[in-house]
Amino acid sequence: MADWRPMLKRREDGFPRIMGIVNVTPDSFHASSRSSNIEHVVETAVRMASEGADWIDVGGESTRPGASPVTIEDELSRVIPAIEAIRSQLPNICISIDTRRSEVAEEALDSGADMVNDVSALSDSGMLLSLIHI
């Protein structure tokens, strides 16, 4: 796993870092970030990287208000193929997994993600333990 800490610091040129968001959900808060199949996921990630994204964030569960939670199995079946496909086409880009679940974070990290974006701020009691071991 690459050391992404320098990339996460402020850029020397003063410009902000850019995160490209790829949601593999049918009900994402941002409709334009939704990707419905692996080919579209890869096309979207490659385009974002070519347009200047510093990293790609992959999410498999909508965080929009009123969204129904998905099972761990459904989330995994959405994000793992996406992460693996992005990693195969963009081997040097940083990939984050957007999840609130430690099980998904662990599988994603094992499948090529580099960091975790947890909007629940580690509310899953296992998340911190999972992150300590990476």
Predicted regions and their residues:
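Catalytic beta/alpha-barrel core
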Residues: 93-100, 114-124
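Conserved small/polar residues in nucleotide/adenosyl-binding loops
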Residues: 132-134
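Active-site mouth loops of central-metabolism enzymes
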Residues: 25-42
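Conserved, mostly hydrophobic/aromatic
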Residues: 22, 48, 52, 98, ...
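Alpha/beta enzyme core
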Residues: 40-58, 110-111
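N-terminal amphipathic alpha-helix/helix-capping segment at the start of soluble metabolic enzymes
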Residues: 1-25
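Glycine-rich, proline-tolerant flexible connector loops at the mouths of alpha/beta enzymes
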Residues: 28-30, 55-80
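Glycine-enriched alpha-helix->loop->beta-strand junction motifs that scaffold or abut catalytic
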Residues: 107-115
